[in-house]
């Protein structure tokens, strides 16, 4: 995340912080608090320091602590002009919270919109368990949750910026560095798939489900906009393994950004209602549809491995992959019958869903 933050600092945030919180404000703050908070009291020799850091003799590689040495861009005088220097944990937290929130919202809305226009099976709107105003409710919950999920996530990024990770930038080509980099993609998927499975299964414990996970299961059949429609603590808990991985295992910094983007794409894809993959090893859209319909199956994120080992795997019905049967009344009636059984089992009488297309059960109390 230091790469993203340095780009933001160079093009926007250095100037913004220098204008909003100039170093001259330090004159009004006791020295004790300046040291405690890591504030910048202003450099009379900032030009000399800037020239030293930008010189050809400076080692231009990512340091253990962000903000000490430039990597992508040369520093300028504004890099030293704010009360909050680049290396300030307060500044790092605030900057990353804004960046992650904006990027998260844009990625969610952009990816889900593309999926809705080009991929999403809109016959789902006719399903008897599609809710009234469902898509608007999905978007509202996701947009309101993403800033809070970002706030919970940012401390992990701050840890990485301050040396508490095994993220790296330099590839050791002489010692099979490229091969190791490729292997990291597979180990990341393997590790995080297990982590999501464990977190997701815990979220289905009755008390935890009612407190945190129930909002996401309001959607019995999904649109792509359901992908990030979580209680913020729920969404954060399911993402923890993505942050634990680089703390304990090596991961290239660019791969880290690619994988985080991929995870968001994948999350949208498994909510798009297009059952393209019937691979028994892949936890695709069909498997996740089974999870939303029947609650107690297919907790994994990418593969079916952990569900098989944990005894929670349920193979999607063949009717999901047959265009003639998928939207047939008989198929939907069978789904509704089983769905109602699981709603009663998991939620009891606490069911406030109002359905769009089922006049007999518009509100199921």
Swiss-Prot record:
Lumenal-facing ranges: 114-140, 264-365
Motif Histidine box-2, chain ranges: 213-217
Pfam families xrefs: FA_hydroxylase
Domain of life from the UniProt record: Eukaryota
E.C. numbers: 1.14.19.20
Cofactor: Fe cation
Job description of the protein: The third module or late pathway involves the ergosterol synthesis itself through consecutive reactions that mainly occur in the endoplasmic reticulum (ER) membrane. Firstly, the squalene synthase ERG9 catalyzes the condensation of 2 farnesyl pyrophosphate moieties to form squalene, which is the precursor of all steroids.
Catalytic activity: episterol + 2 Fe(II)-[cytochrome b5] + O2 + 2 H(+) = 5-dehydroepisterol + 2 Fe(III)-[cytochrome b5] + 2 H2O
Protein name, as recorded: Delta(7)-sterol 5(6)-desaturase ERG3
Localization annotation: Endoplasmic reticulum membrane
Membrane-spanning segments: 93-113, 141-161, 243-263
Domain Fatty acid hydroxylase, chain residue ranges per copy: 187-311
Family: Belongs to the sterol desaturase family.
Motif Histidine box-3, chain ranges: 288-292
InterPro entries according to UniProt: Fatty_acid_hydroxylase, Sterol_Desaturase_Related
Organism encoding this protein: Saccharomyces cerevisiae (strain ATCC 204508 / S288c)
């Amino acid at each position: 995340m230091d790469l993203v933050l340095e780009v933001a600092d160079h093009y926007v945030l250095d100037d913004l912080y220098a204008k909003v919180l100039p170093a001259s404000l330090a004159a009004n703050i006791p020295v004790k608090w300046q040291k405690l908070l890591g504030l910048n009291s202003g450099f009379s020799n900032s030009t000399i320091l800037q020239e030293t850091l930008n010189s050809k003799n400076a080692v231009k590689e990512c340091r253990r602590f962000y903000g000490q040495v430039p990597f992508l861009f040369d520093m300028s005088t504004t890099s030293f002009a704010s009360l909050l220097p680049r290396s300030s944990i307060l500044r790092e937290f605030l900057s990353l919270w804004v960046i992650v929130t904006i990027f998260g919202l844009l990625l969610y809305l952009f990816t889900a919109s593309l999926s809705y226009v080009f991929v999403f099976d809109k016959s789902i709107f006719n399903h008897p368990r599609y809710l009234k105003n469902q898509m608007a409710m999905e978007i509202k919950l996701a947009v309101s949750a993403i800033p809070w999920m970002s706030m919970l996530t940012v401390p992990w990024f701050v840890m990485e910026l301050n040396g508490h990770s095994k993220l790296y930038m330099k590839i050791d080509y002489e010692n099979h560095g490229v091969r190791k980099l490729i292997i990291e993609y597979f180990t990341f998927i393997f590790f995080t798939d297990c982590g999501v499975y464990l977190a997701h299964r815990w979220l289905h414990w009755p008390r935890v489900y009612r407190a945190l996970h129930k909002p996401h299961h309001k959607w019995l059949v999904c649109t792509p906009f359901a992908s990030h429609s979580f209680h913020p603590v729920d969404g954060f808990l399911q993402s923890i393994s993505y942050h634990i991985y680089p703390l304990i295992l090596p991961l290239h910094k660019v791969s880290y950004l690619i994988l985080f983007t991929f995870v968001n794409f994948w999350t949208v894809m498994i909510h798009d209602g297009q059952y393209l993959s019937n691979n028994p090893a892949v936890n695709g859209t069909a498997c996740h549809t089974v999870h939303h319909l029947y609650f107690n199956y297919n907790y994994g994120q990418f593969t079916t491995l952990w569900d098989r080992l944990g005894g929670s795997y349920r193979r999607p019905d063949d009717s999901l992959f047959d265009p003639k049967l998928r939207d047939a009344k008989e198929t939907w009636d069978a789904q509704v019958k089983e769905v109602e059984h699981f709603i009663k089992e998991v939620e009891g009488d606490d069911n406030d869903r109002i359905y769009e297309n089922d006049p007999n059960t518009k509100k199921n109390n």
